[in-house]
Amino acid sequence: MISSLRGDVIDKGLDYVVIECGGVGYRCLATGDTLATLRRGESAFVLTSLVIRDDAHTLYAFSTSEQRETFGILQKVSGVGARLAMGVMSVLQPADIARAVEEGDIKTLQQAPGVGKRLAERMAVDLKGKFPALEATSGQATIGDIAATGNDTALQSQVVEALVGLGFTEAKAATAVKKILEEQNGTTDPSSVLREALQRLSGQKR
């Protein structure tokens, strides 16, 4: 089991990072919060979780133990796999998830991509009391420090690819991203576009 990595960041995208350890590059999926703490060419340390499936072995990277713990707890709910858990964590902080579960705040949970009313209700019931170690704090890193590209086409493709990876259709993702880029003329921050697209597309699902 690979539980952490320490090495140089040799590549980074909108939803992944590659860390070289001992001459081997490990590709890890991560949320914007974790990616915001990493810089290409610099040394890094991340906590990891290895998810093994029949068709793939996937590493997920986290900058805090709270993030990794939340990732594991979310998957205890029937119907919530690693991809959906990361989708939830891409728009909600661990403390916000814990608070929403304890208070039965279904609407907050529904902000996450792929989480409808029924699943949100199941999460609130099944996970209640499972977050005792998470404090309701707001001092964690926020999305917005990911390296940007100055080309709208490249930015759009990058965000659309991330949305498709989270379960949205390419057509819906492309339409949403295009509209956001038109409204936010001149933006070069893919993470802010991704967050806005997630909120809009999740709202459409509800």
Swiss-Prot record:
Primary location group: cytoplasm
Subcellular compartments: Cytoplasm
GO BP: DNA recombination; DNA repair
GO CC term, one of those recorded: cytoplasm
Keywords linked to the UniProt accession: Cytoplasm, DNA damage, DNA recombination, DNA repair, DNA-binding
Region (Flexible linker): 143-150
Role of this protein: The RuvA-RuvB-RuvC complex processes Holliday junction (HJ) DNA during genetic recombination and DNA repair, while the RuvA-RuvB complex plays an important role in the rescue of blocked DNA replication forks via replication fork reversal (RFR). RuvA specifically binds to HJ cruciform DNA, conferring on it an open structure. The RuvB hexamer acts as an ATP-dependent pump, pulling dsDNA into and through the RuvAB complex. HJ branch migration allows RuvC to scan DNA until it finds its consensus sequence, where it cleaves and resolves the cruciform DNA.
Self-association state and partner proteins as the record states: Homotetramer. Forms an RuvA(8)-RuvB(12)-Holliday junction (HJ) complex. HJ DNA is sandwiched between 2 RuvA tetramers; dsDNA enters through RuvA and exits via RuvB. An RuvB hexamer assembles on each DNA strand where it exits the tetramer. Each RuvB hexamer is contacted by two RuvA subunits (via domain III) on 2 adjacent RuvB subunits; this complex drives branch migration. In the full resolvosome a probable DNA-RuvA(4)-RuvB(12)-RuvC(2) complex forms which resolves the HJ.
Protein name per UniProt: Holliday junction branch migration complex subunit RuvA
Organism expressing this protein natively: Corynebacterium urealyticum (strain ATCC 43042 / DSM 7109)
The organism's taxonomic lineage, starting at the top: Bacteria, Bacillati, Actinomycetota, Actinomycetes, Mycobacteriales
Gene field: ruvA
